[in-house]
Amino acid sequence: MQIFGKILGGFFGFLFGGFFGAALGIFIGHQFDKAKRMANSGFTFQTGGASQTQRQAEFFHAAYAVMGHVAKAKGQVTREEIQLASMMMDRMNLSDEQKREAQEAFREGKESDFPLRETLRNIRSITGGRYDLLQFFLELQIAAAIADGDIHPSERDVLHIVAEELGFSAEQLEKRLRMQEAAFRFQQGGGFSGHQSGGSHQQGQWQQASSASQLKDAYNLLGISEDADPKTIKRAHRKLMNEHHPDKLVAKGLPPEMMNMAKEKAQEIQAAYDLIKKEKGIK
């Protein structure tokens, strides 16, 4: 049974304001048993022999485990993060078994002997080195680190390892960090608000804000400077929308259940672009 409809109800509402790992864990709780059964049978997730479903299950298991490692980097997972994680799981009506499975994967990443580099190299292998999927994985980890509003130096160190093993330079990571931090502020400042519909899912509704700080965050979210010309602005927008195009990501291996997640990310990008267009008078 697909449970992403449950995830969507809170996923992006908490993406930049709460415990991101909990939201993803809801989906992983559904997928984890598949990965565990395959691991117990001695299956090795390599691009050549694994089915797409198997690779997808491994992708999510690893994503949640690495999030646990990121969260633990600063010494302990904060009380606020735990409370938000529990609240998210309760709101999504997870079964006790699903909660245990999600928590098990997260705890695995928190262990001091968690094989971070090996796990990341495996992710790079099972994705076939596809840039968009690896970028998506990196963005998940950044979102986990920024969930409580601040990135601890130890979390930043772990993120540098994640980026390195996935094939991203330190400069690329720092740019992504700036973009995600801007997205956090953009959401907190009113760029995004969510409301529940029918009790089953949450639809993001973007709201425009014309304050100087919101505009600055919109530029940073797109990864461009405030003095960028219209051509540069449009090119940055097209590039980001192409990288986060739901259909393209699914075609490259992202589970179909996560298509709506990619759609929400695209909405975030579009909201920033629309604000800049309005302020600049771009047609």
UniProtKB/Swiss-Prot annotation:
SUPFAM superfamilies in the record: Chaperone J-domain, TerB-like
Subcellular location, record wording: Cell inner membrane
Membrane topology value: Single-pass type III membrane protein
Side of membrane Periplasmic, spans: 1-6
GO (cellular component) term, any one: plasma membrane
Keywords assigned: Cell inner membrane, Cell membrane, Chaperone, Membrane, Transmembrane, Transmembrane helix
Span of domain J: 217-283
Region (Disordered): 188-210
Cytoplasmic side: 31-283
Transmembrane segments: 7-30
Pfam families: DnaJ, TerB
Gene Ontology terms for molecular function: protein-folding chaperone binding
Bias kind Gly residues: ranges: 188-197
Keyword Cell membrane: yes
Assembly, per entry: Homodimer.
Domain description: The transmembrane domain is a dimerization domain.
Its biological purpose: Regulatory DnaK co-chaperone. Direct interaction between DnaK and DjlA is needed for the induction of the wcaABCDE operon, involved in the synthesis of a colanic acid polysaccharide capsule, possibly through activation of the RcsB/RcsC phosphotransfer signaling pathway. The colanic acid capsule may help the bacterium survive conditions outside the host.
Official protein name in the record: Co-chaperone protein DjlA
